[in-house]
């Protein structure tokens, strides 16, 4: 009996059910925390990658945008633009620059349709036969393509690629990681790190953050005439009869609340982590999903 007692006391006590459940619960909590940390780390990396992509694209966009402006300022406006400007040569030159920008950077397939008489190109360039060769290429590339929510992204990709003039690294090689055909329509789009198409706004104006980004000093002449293309305020003249037509076709000119011109620059946007853009056609906020959007004008160029 003494021997049996010694043998019994030497046996290792097993875990109780409660102890096993506690261990399992601890492991589950640690696994959940680890998974959360990994997901959070991936989210931060996706954010950084998207910001890097947008900065790269914006740098390329700004270079091509500036080139189109410089060339347009050397040209004489078309008769149709001069008529819209009410015969004012300075105002006509400002409008002509915006016309050329609309030609170089379309945001919708219909803007390239030769059969739609009300497009900017068909109204103000085509009658004088001065359509740029790259626009003819645009028309061929989008022929038969249907409109949709991704077309501004496809249009920007098409423009940046077609307008490349230097002999360096090809545009596609620079951003091939950010190109995909997300909807299978045969037109590639520029995408963010979450795989969603970026959006491109050519002449946005209705966004408080964008207007606050005006780099000119408050109270200065440049702040009042904050349209970078119309630094003289030619479009703000109240006696200009063609202004309603211009605003309907391009963008509103004057902020009625402040009396200043709108700060109008091209903008590239990602829907961000929640993958909801929630923006109107004028860059206005249309829902809570816009809160985490990533805007090009908020990122400093390297």
Give the location of each predicted region.
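N-terminal leader/signal peptides at the extreme start of proteins
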Residues: 1-15
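A generic helix-loop boundary/linker signal
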Residues: 20, 28-31, 47, 185, ...
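Aliphatic-rich helix starts adjacent to a transmembrane/signal segment
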Residues: 35-56
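N-terminal pilin/flagellin-like segments and related low-complexity appendage regions
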Residues: 51-302
């Amino acid at each position: 009996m003494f021997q049996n007692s010694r043998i019994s006391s030497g046996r290792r006590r097993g875990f109780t059910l409660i102890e096993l459940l506690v261990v399992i619960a601890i492991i589950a909590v640690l696994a959940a925390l680890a998974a959360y940390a990994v997901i959070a780390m991936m989210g931060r990396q996706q954010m950084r990658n998207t910001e890097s992509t947008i900065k790269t694209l914006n740098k390329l966009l700004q270079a091509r945008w500036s080139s189109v402006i410089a060339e347009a300022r050397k040209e004489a406006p078309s008769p149709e633009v001069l008529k819209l400007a009410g015969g004012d040569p300075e105002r006509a030159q400002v409008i002509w620059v915006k016309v050329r920008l609309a030609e170089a950077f379309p945001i919708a397939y219909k803007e390239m349709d030769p059969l739609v008489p009300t497009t900017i190109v068909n109204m103000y360039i085509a009658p004088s036969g001065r359509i740029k060769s790259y626009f003819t290429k645009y028309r061929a590339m989008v022929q038969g393509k249907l409109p949709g929510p991704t077309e501004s992204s496809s249009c920007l990709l098409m423009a940046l690629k077609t307008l490349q003039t230097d002999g360096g690294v090809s545009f596609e090689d620079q951003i091939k990681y950010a190109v995909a055909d997300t909807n299978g329509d045969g037109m590639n789009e520029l995408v963010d790190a979450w795989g969603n198409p970026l959006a491109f706004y050519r002449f946005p104006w209705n966004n408080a953050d964008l207007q606050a980004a005006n780099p000119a000093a408050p109270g200065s002449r440049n702040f009042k005439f904050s349209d970078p293309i119309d630094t003289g305020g030619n479009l703000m003249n109240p006696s200009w009869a063609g202004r309603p037509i211009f605003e309907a076709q391009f963008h509103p000119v004057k902020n009625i609340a402040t009396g200043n011109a709108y700060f109008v620059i091209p903008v590239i946007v990602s829907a961000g982590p929640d993958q909801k853009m929630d923006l109107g056609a004028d860059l206005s906020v249309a829902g809570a999903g816009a809160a985490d959007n990533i805007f090009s004008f908020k990122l400093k160029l390297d």
